[in-house]
A protein has these predicted regions:
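N-terminal leader/targeting segments and the immediate start of mature chains
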Residues: 15-66
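Generic short beta-strand segments
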Residues: 60-67, 170-179, 212-218
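An acidic-aromatic
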Residues: 78-135
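Acidic, serine/threonine-rich low-complexity disordered tracts
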Residues: 188-193, 198-246
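N-terminal Sec-pathway targeting helices
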Residues: 1-16, 20
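Short, cysteine-centered beta-strand-loop-beta hairpins and adjacent loop/turn segments enriched
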Residues: 67-71, 99-103, 176-186, 221
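N-terminal Sec/ER secretory leader and immediately downstream segment
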Residues: 52, 57-98
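Short helix-loop boundary/capping segments
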Residues: 126-208
Length: 246
């Protein structure tokens, strides 16, 4: 009888270990899923993000420009948007940097942007940064993420580092209806790389997700002989309501 009970106990322990391992594995794999991006791309009103992030959020939008006659020199625009959940207030700040060929940078200007509602901000007309923001739109306002676009696509590269808590996938595309043409270069007609990156922390503890679109065959197409070569956008928050939807 004792031997029988021992076998039952061992079996129950093994079942428990298997269940725990399976649950952890499923959670591990769920954190490598990017389907949640359908909630954010596109977004037509930044205030919609408050329902996902109860303790504030930030959107970091970066765009880089190459200019004719300045080889190796990059103009970088960084826009940091902050949403305060308690007051439902949204504020933004934009910085203009000159990145030199040796990758050192020179800060040229910092300006405050006034939120107008939706995904719109008042852009100053009399600043150095103004010319780079004439057609400014958030990536989340224009990019339409559809999981089916990537279901059959083979990633160029997968970076998976649980130790540092990060996961990235990079794809190569030549055409895609998902990409709009409002960024100073028509991504839909260019060869480009698109990259998705994220924190592997459970979403209900911490959320950090980045999407980057980088052109590979850019040519200046504007009167200023300037074209965007990179558009990157990160959504970051201390806590989210997405964890229960994994």
């Amino acid at each position: 009888m004792n031997r029988y009970l021992k076998r039952i106990m061992i079996l129950l322990v093994l079942v428990g270990i298997s269940t725990f391992t399976y649950t952890r594995w499923m959670g591990h794999m769920a954190l490598r899923n990017f389907d949640y991006l359908e909630k954010f791309y596109p977004t037509k009103d930044l205030r919609e993000l408050f329902k996902y992030f109860p303790e504030d959020f930030a959107v970091i939008h970066i765009r880089e420009f190459a200019e004719e006659g300045k080889p190796g020199q990059i103009i970088s625009i960084r826009i940091i948007i902050e949403g305060e959940s308690k007051t439902q207030k949204i504020s933004a700040k934009a910085t203009l940097d000159n990145i030199l060929p040796d990758r050192s940078s020179e800060k040229l200007e910092t300006v405050d942007l006034t939120y107008r509602g939706g995904v719109s901000f008042d852009i100053p007309k009399d600043k150095q940064i103004s010319t780079y923001l004439n057609d400014f739109e958030l990536l989340m306002a224009k990019y339409d993420y559809r999981a089916e676009d990537f279901a059959q696509a083979k990633p160029l590269e997968i970076y998976d580092n649980p130790v540092h808590g990060s996961y990235e996938r990079r794809y190569n595309f030549e055409t895609s209806d998902s990409i709009s043409s409002g960024y100073g270069v028509d991504f839909s007609k260019s060869k480009y790389e698109i990259e998705f990156g994220k924190s592997l922390s459970p979403f209900d503890r911490f959320f950090d997700s980045t999407i980057r679109i980088r052109t590979k065959d850019f040519k200046p197409i504007s009167n200023e002989a300037r074209t965007m070569i990179l558009c990157s956008e990160t959504i970051s928050a201390d806590r989210s309501n997405l964890g229960s939807e994994r």
